[in-house]
Amino acid sequence: MSQPSGGRAPGTRIYSWSCPTVMSPGEKLDPIPDSFILQPPVFHPVVPYVTTIFGGLHAGKMVMLQGVVPLDAHRFQVDFQCGCSLCPRPDIAFHFNPRFHTTKPHVICNTLHGGRWQREARWPHLALRRGSSFLILFLFGNEEVKVSVNGQHFLHFRYRLPLSHVDTLGIFGDILVEAVGFLNINPFVEGSREYPAGHPFLLMSPRLEVPCSHALPQGLSPGQVIIVRGLVLQEPKHFTVSLRDQAAHAPVTLRASFADRTLAWISRWGQKKLISAPFLFYPQRFFEVLLLFQEGGLKLALNGQGLGATSMNQQALEQLRELRISGSVQLYCVHS
C-alpha cells in the first residue's frame, strides 16, 4: 500500500512507499540507483504514525522531526524499528522517549530486542517544553546516533542492534507533528554540516512561492552551501537555479530540461555544459540540490550524491547577490 506524502487518516499505518510518476504511454523511467532517490517529507501526519524508511537506515542518513509539544503532554516516543509487525512486536534499535509529567522532565533512550527492553539510558535537562515548537534532528553514524534539539546537540546513543536492520519509523504519544523529513548528510567534507541546526521544511510558505528570489547580501564565500529542496510538479516544463550579480546578470545557471531529460550548467553567454548523472526530476519526486562554493568555482550534489564541479571566477562569485529559482517545482526549503 502506498500513500501520498501529505497527512494521513487516523490510524493509518504505512508499510511501503513509492514515488508516483506520470508517464506517456509506452514511456519508461531511466534506471536510477537507490542512492539517488530521496523519500519525500510527510506533512501533518496523524499520530500514531508508522512508515517505512525507504532504503532503510545507514550511516550518513538524517531524519528530521518538526512539531509542537501539547500543553498537557505526558510523553511521546520516536522509535526506529526493525519491521512494522504488530504481533510479535518488532525490535526497536533506538527508542527516543521524552517525558514531561515528572517533576524533572527527562529523556529515556533504550533498545527493545526479542520482546525485552535492555538497560535504559537517561538524559536530564530536557530541551523540549510543553506548548513549544521544536525541531529534532537524528543523525545516524557508523556506531551511534546523534540527536539535536532546536539546533543544539543533546545526546548520542551507541547502537545495540545493527543499523542495517532498521527500516521503519514509528511516532507515538503526546505530540503534534508538522513534518517528517528524510535526508542524506552533506557529501562535501569541506562544506558546512546541517547537523545540529537543521533547516525546517515549510509547506505552502509565501516566502517559497515560485519564482523564488533569495537575497545574498554578502555574496558567497568558500565553504558556503546553498540548499534547495522541493517537489517536482505533476506536469513539469522546466526548472532552473540561477545565481545573479548586482547587474542582474546570471554568470551561472543550473537547468533541468524535461524534454530531453538532461541537466546542464548554462553560462552567462548561453553556453551549455551537460552534467553526467541520472535524471532525477520526475513528476511528484522529491529532490535536493546542494551547491558548495569553493575557490575557483562550485560543486554540485543532487539528493546527497556529489556530481563534480564547475569553474567560476572568484571575483564573480563574490559579486553574486541573488539566488533565483524558477520552474515547475514546489519548494520546501531554501537556505544559504
Curated annotation (Swiss-Prot):
GO biological process, one term: intrinsic apoptotic signaling pathway
Native organism: Homo sapiens
CDD domains: GLECT
InterPro entries membership: ConA-like_dom_sf, Galectin-like, Galectin_CRD
Membrane-traversing stretches: none
Coiled coil spans: none
Entry comment, domain topic: Contains two homologous but distinct carbohydrate-binding domains.
Highest taxon listed in the record's lineage: Eukaryota
Pfam families, alphabetized: Gal-bind_lectin
Gene3D superfamilies found in the cross-reference section: 2.60.120.200
SUPFAM superfamilies: Concanavalin A-like lectins/glucanases
Tissues expressed in: Not widely expressed. Predominantly expressed in adipose tissue.
Keywords associated with the record: Apoptosis, Lectin, Nucleus, Repeat
Entry's Gene Ontology molecular function annotations: lactose binding
Galectin domain sequence ranges: 49-183, 212-336
Record-level GO cellular component terms: cytoplasm; mitochondrion; nucleus
Location in the cell: Nucleus
Stated name of the protein: Galectin-12
Primary role: Binds lactose. May participate in the apoptosis of adipocytes.
